[in-house]
């Protein structure tokens, strides 16, 4: 698991970051996004629940904002993701991106690997992330009729039966 790695982990988002990819990006210690990127949680539109990734999302934004994104499937652009705390750094160009990565690398190289590992372990326990419960909720949804329909409609490139047109 990304969040359990003893090293500092960095996610770079350059383009669409949707559903589980959004959660994986949020699981990293540091998240850098390009201004042109966008983030989206589409699970509820597929009859699923973003439960397995919710602990990581809740570590990066307010509960209220996470609830809105999870329930409605709204998009966040890179700038908004940065302004609400999803992303730690916002890069406007690849030159900016490489500068930020270089700065982070330089800072990490000054830190004790053991101290980083112990700090990460301590922070994880302090947040009490219940991945097993989150996984169980996802399993329940994916095995429900609506979860199966949502996945089938996704692969068939059509709306699920409950999606009403505007």
Identify the function of each model-found stretch.
Residues 1-46, 75:
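Glycine-rich beta-to-alpha active-site loop
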Residues 55-64:
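Hydrophobic, secondary-structure "cap" segments at the distal end of domains
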């Amino acid at each position: 698991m990304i969040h359990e790695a003893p090293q500092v982990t960095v996610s770079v988002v350059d383009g669409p970051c949707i559903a589980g990819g959004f959660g994986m990006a949020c699981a990293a210690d540091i998240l850098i996004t390009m201004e042109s990127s966008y983030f989206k949680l589409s699970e509820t539109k597929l009859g699923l629940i973003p439960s397995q990734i919710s602990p990581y999302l809740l570590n990066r934004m307010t509960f209220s904002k996470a609830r809105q994104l999870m329930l409605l499937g709204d998009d966040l652009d890179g700038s908004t993701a940065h302004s609400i705390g999803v992303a730690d750094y916002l890069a406007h160009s690849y030159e900016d991106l490489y500068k930020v990565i270089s700065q982070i690398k330089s800072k990490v190289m000054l830190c004790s690997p053991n101290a980083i590992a112990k700090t990460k372990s301590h922070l994880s326990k302090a947040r009490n992330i219940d991945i097993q419960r989150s996984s169980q909720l996802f399993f329940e949804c994916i095995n429900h009729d609506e979860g199966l329909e949502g996945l089938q409609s996704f692969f068939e490139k059509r709306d699920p039966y409950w999606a009403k047109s505007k």
